[in-house]
Amino acid sequence: TPADSPSSSTSKAAVSSAVSLAGICPSTIVVQTDWYPEADDFIPYQLAAANGTVNTSNKSYTAELLASGKDTGVKIQVRAGGPAIGDQLVPAEMYEDSSILLGFVETDEGIELSSTQPTVAIVADRQEAPTIIAWSAAEHPGVKTISQLGKTGATVLYYNGAPFMSYLTGAGILSSKQPDGAYNGTPAQFVASGGKDALQGFATAEPYEYAHEVSQWDKPLTYQLVSDYGYDPYPALATLPQNITKYAACFKKLVPIIQQGIVDYAKNPGPTDALIVKLVQEYNSGWEYDAGEAAYAAKTMVSDKIIANSPDGTVGAFDDSRISKLITLLRPIYARDGKTVKAGLTPQDITTNQFLDPSIHLPG
């Protein structure tokens, strides 16, 4: 069962009954992230009190779980992912360690693992994935979109096996000769090309890093979100299928707290970003992430509508037709890679809106 049994029902005096999760949720709600602390994965840090306990050996942070600053009577433990878990995918980690209640699983990954390690996403922490293709405007004057970049023949550096690239070439947006899967995330190849190459990245990271942190380049990049072309998985918090029933009462109270946390972060990201940067420094893992990049990421997520309301006006909701299209689009791509998507997979198999409070939304 996720970390401990349901917590003691004797709630502390400071716990408001309106937001109390005590006795309903596990006493410690464990959230597995997909990387070291960064603004993209803001939501569990947004819910965590700033005076928690840092475990530098296993790269985790445990603190009181707060609902807009109010103590809920349970704790949250946020675990770093990526190299901190041996570069294992989050669902694999969730299946190995049943103490993990929630993990970051984008819906394309949910589709990919639907027959082997299925998960169900219970809230979309962001409406769009921040995945981009970026390029130098100086080297590619007049190129404003990925499809225009496709007409230049420029090499596009990307992580080999990324399914969105199979989609972009299959749809004729990029030519099959353009992708170079040898990219490892370091700037060396891009810099060596003098900016003639384009590269995969995140709207929340590379445009800032190449302008401010890559001393060999130190110039801005132009970019476009891959989701603009119809490859648009949701970044989401997911759980194992059996937990949907087992923790239904918990999720009914927790998910609206998460939704409000998204709204609160969009309005005032500073305190959470400060916690994220502090944890990066304390983990001291070789991952570099400073306050400038965190602030840039928070601002970009709002301005690029990565953090946004869903079409129905609710923050955190999934759109079934969008997920259906993604399933249709990905099935042949994964089949080519020898991965079998569950037969007859529906959006309801991998996502649910049942725990959302439809009244919670971003202003505007």
Question: What are the functions of these language-model segments?
Answer:
Residues 1-17:
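Extracellular mucin-like PTS domains
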Residues 12-184, 197, 201, 224:
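Short, glycine-/small- and polar/acidic-enriched structural segments
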Residues 53-71, 223-225, 229-230, 245, ...:
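Short, solvent-exposed loop/beta-turn-alpha elements that line the ligand-binding surface or hinge
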Residues 108-109, 183-286:
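Pocket-lining segment of extracytoplasmic ligand-binding domains
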Residues 127-133, 137-139, 233-237, 242, ...:
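Small-molecule pocket liners
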Residues 247-337:
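Secondary-structure end/capping motifs
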Residues 320-364:
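Conserved C-terminal helix/tail region of periplasmic/extracytoplasmic solute-binding proteins
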